[in-house]
């Protein structure tokens, strides 16, 4: 969330940042609400101060036996007791209005972020590896999985509907191996601490990382059975729990409502979890295969750090995610996202796009990881702070990245390591996790 003081100090810069996001200027309307809020707070504080002073003056008047003065002051205090709740309510309402408006506005991109309105404005940063040459036409992962008999979308549809999959035997084992390999890499070589977090979280936790209020329709929600028949819609919204769309939500919020010792920073956390996304805006897109699922597995990387270190931490996080694909010997490219294509909470984002030879007409790059620095944007929403060099609390900076999406890594491995007979060669780095198995083939 944005700092209203920063907007007050430089409204032109704020509006310029919003323009790069494709948004209209908002500083004037925000500052008008802020002015009302400050005036209401001042009026409430002045009324409280006057009530305190008048109460003291009543005692002085009574000591001086000035009953008329005391009666006048008592009447004033009685009137203030009536008006003060109204003033406090007005101040609270203005504060809530400002918070509501600020909470729906995305983060401001760094100056170095390229301009652009969508993915067409993204800029290639660098490329790793090369496309492989096959002596046959590479197949899509779902064709490979169906032929093996280990990828069943029909069974999943019977259980849960569209955008789910049942993996079996060698492919189920391969997906598990990929996730374990990623976790081991990040914890043993990259210095991340493994966390096993809750998958169901409160509204305020979703708010903290920016899923609420703007992206409510993209989430899956769980409610207690006793609430199903409740006519109280507000109670439903208050008591519901959200299924995490990414472990970023749980991991980042571990710092919420805390003042950390900066000696503890950077705090680097990782988790392998199922993730759940309603994909409300994805109707008709990627309907085939495992590319876009309602439920998928992902290894998440989160860093909590100081303002001075956050930019360097982004480069480090990107490198950690890249090493997953390098060790799997997968061809990929890194893209710097343009301002119009970045996520809501991000100041700068790198996307890693892995080459999938079975996709499209002759193969295509598909996103497998996003690494973002968010500055203090999420920290303000969570009230996550650290004690700085001067001993005063200040907001931490947060970063998050996929390290990486396990399902998409499975797809990339299947399509990259497919053999002409439809079997899948197991990358050497994964073979220890597969009991030494070198090839996945049909029983």
From Swiss-Prot:
Family matches, as SUPFAM superfamilies: Class II aaRS and biotin synthetases (SSF55681), tRNA-binding arm (SSF46589)
PANTHER family: SERINE--TRNA LIGASE, SERYL-TRNA SYNTHETASE
Reactions accelerated catalytically: tRNA(Ser) + L-serine + ATP = L-seryl-tRNA(Ser) + AMP + diphosphate + H(+); tRNA(Sec) + L-serine + ATP = L-seryl-tRNA(Sec) + AMP + diphosphate + H(+)
Superkingdom in the source lineage: Bacteria
Keyword terms, alphabetized: Aminoacyl-tRNA synthetase, ATP-binding, Cytoplasm, Ligase, Nucleotide-binding, Protein biosynthesis
Family: Belongs to the class-II aminoacyl-tRNA synthetase family. Type-1 seryl-tRNA synthetase subfamily.
GO cellular component terms listed in the entry, alphabetical order: cytoplasm
Amino acids binding L-serine: 246-248, 300, 402
Organism in which the protein naturally occurs: Bradyrhizobium diazoefficiens (strain JCM 10833 / BCRC 13528 / IAM 13628 / NBRC 14792 / USDA 110)
Entry comment, domain topic: Consists of two distinct domains, a catalytic core and a N-terminal extension that is involved in tRNA binding.
EC number(s) reported in the record: 6.1.1.11
Main function: Catalyzes the attachment of serine to tRNA(Ser). Is also able to aminoacylate tRNA(Sec) with serine, to form the misacylated tRNA L-seryl-tRNA(Sec), which will be further converted into selenocysteinyl-tRNA(Sec).
Protein's recorded name: Serine--tRNA ligase
CDD domains: SerRS_core
Binding annotation for ATP: 277-279, 367-370
Subcellular location: Cytoplasm
InterPro entries named in the record: aa-tRNA-synt_IIb, aa-tRNA-synth_II, aa-tRNA-synth_II/BPL/LPL, Ser-tRNA-ligase_type_1, Ser-tRNA-synth_1_N, SerRS_1_N_sf, SerRS_core, tRNA-bd_arm
Keyword Nucleotide-binding tagged: yes
Annotated gene: serS
């Amino acid at each position: 969330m944005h700092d209203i003081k920063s907007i007050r100090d430089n409204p032109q810069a704020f509006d310029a940042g919003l323009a790069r996001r494709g948004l209209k200027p908002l500083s004037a309307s925000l500052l008008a609400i802020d002015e009302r809020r400050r005036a209401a707070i001042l009026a409430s504080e002045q009324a409280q101060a006057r009530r305190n002073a008048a109460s003291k003056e009543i005692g002085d008047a009574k000591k001086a036996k000035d009953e008329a003065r005391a009666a006048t002051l008592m009447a004033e205090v009685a009137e203030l007791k009536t008006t003060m709740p109204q003033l406090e309510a007005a101040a609270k309402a203005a504060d809530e209005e400002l918070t509501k408006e600020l909470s729906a506005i995305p983060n401001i991109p760094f100056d170095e972020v390229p301009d652009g309105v969508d993915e067409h404005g993204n800029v290639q940063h660098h490329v790793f590896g090369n496309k492989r040459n096959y002596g046959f036409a590479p197949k899509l992962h779902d064709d490979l999985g169906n032929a093996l008999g280990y990828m069943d979308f029909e069974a999943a549809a019977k259980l849960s509907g569209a955008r789910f999959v049942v993996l079996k035997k060698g492919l189920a084992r391969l997906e598990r191996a990929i996730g374990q390999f990623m976790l081991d890499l990040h914890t043993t070589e990259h210095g991340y601490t493994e966390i096993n977090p809750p998958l169901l979280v409160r509204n305020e936790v979703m708010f903290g990382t920016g899923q609420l209020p703007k992206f409510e329709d993209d989430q899956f929600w769980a409610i207690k059975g006793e609430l199903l028949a409740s006519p109280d819609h507000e109670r439903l919204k208050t008591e519901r729990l959200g299924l995490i769309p990414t472990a970023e939500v749980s991991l980042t919020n571990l710092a919420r409502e805390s003042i950390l010792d900066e000696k503890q920073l950077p705090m680097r956390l990782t988790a392998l979890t199922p993730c759940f996304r309603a994909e409300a805006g994805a109707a008709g897109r990627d309907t085939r295969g495992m590319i876009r699922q309602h439920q998928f597995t992902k290894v998440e990387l989160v860093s909590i750090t100081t303002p001075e270190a956050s930019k360097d931490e982004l480069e480090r996080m990107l490198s950690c995610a890249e090493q997953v694909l390098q060790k799997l010997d997968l061809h990929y490219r890194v893209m710097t996202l343009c301002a119009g294509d970045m996520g809501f909470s991000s100041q700068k984002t790198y996307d890693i796009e892995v080459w999938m030879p079975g996709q499209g007409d002759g193969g295509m790059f598909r996103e497998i990881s996003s690494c973002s620095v968010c500055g203090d944007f999420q920290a303000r929403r969570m009230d996550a702070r650290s004690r700085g060099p001067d001993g005063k609390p200040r907001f931490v900076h947060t970063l998050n990245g996929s390290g990486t999406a396990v399902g998409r890594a499975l797809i990339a491995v299947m399509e990259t390591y497919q053999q002409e007979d439809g079997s899948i060669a197991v990358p050497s780095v994964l073979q220890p996790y597969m009991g030494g198995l070198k090839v996945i083939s049909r029983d």
